[in-house]
Amino acid sequence: MEGRVQLMKALLARPLRPAARRWRNPIPFPETFDGDTDRLPEFIVQTSSYMFVDENTFSNDALKVTFLITRLTGPALQWVIPYIKKESPLLSDYRGFLAEMKRVFGWEEDEDF
């Protein structure tokens, strides 16, 4: 019993370590996208950059697509709802999802994000 008391005293006497600081993504949180074709390139750059620097969080295509969906509003959000309802394979295919967004919202660039 005395040994436990001594151990407890020793543990209590140790200085507390400061709580580990949570890692913070240095890229600004992406703005939402409402379907405006002119903003689609900017939206893709913002979301891609944000995910690129945090590969641990966005470790697979399904997580990347899910993140994109959370940033959709208005007509863009309405567009994606049928894909969610029918559990489309595009929800697990980041490049395919981006290609479909580009097609639907009228961006004809060949650039690969």
Swiss-Prot record:
Pfam families: DUF4939
Entries under InterPro entries matching the protein: DUF4939
Superkingdom field: Eukaryota
Note: RTL8B is one of at least 11 genes called Mar or Mart related to long terminal repeat retrotransposons. They do not correspond to functional retrotransposons, but rather to neofunctionalized retrotransposons genes.
Family membership: Belongs to the FAM127 family.
Protein's name according to its UniProt entry: Retrotransposon Gag-like protein 8B
Native source organism of the sequence: Homo sapiens (Human)
